[in-house]
Amino acid sequence: MIHKLTSEERKTRLEGLPHWTAVPGRDAIQRSLRFADFNEAFGFMTRIAIKAQEMNHHPEWFNVYNRVDITLSTHDAHGLTERDILLAQFIDHVCAHTQPAA
């Protein structure tokens, strides 16, 4: 069974994810990204989708043209888990190598 992060675990784990913010009213984190164009945004989403499928852990996301908004939370645990942290770290790693627009 997947356990929801405790308040202390959450605080400690999120210190390493400065680009992610808490979602108001939910035990979830979010990040918004902008890319040069739709092709770059979709390419980024494809890389994340492949990893998410491998992890069997899928983000909630929204895409319009060059913008991608991502929310992470584990539905089975009703909140933030280590799976969300690992996927957020992977997303940050991909961002560091794809250089989204400011």
From Swiss-Prot:
SUPFAM superfamilies assigned: PCD-like (SSF55248)
Leader sequence segment: none
Keyword Lyase attributed: yes
Protein's name in the database: Putative pterin-4-alpha-carbinolamine dehydratase
Keywords, sorted A to Z: Lyase
Catalytic activity reported: (4aS,6R)-4a-hydroxy-L-erythro-5,6,7,8-tetrahydrobiopterin = (6R)-L-erythro-6,7-dihydrobiopterin + H2O
Pfam families: Pterin_4a (PF01329)
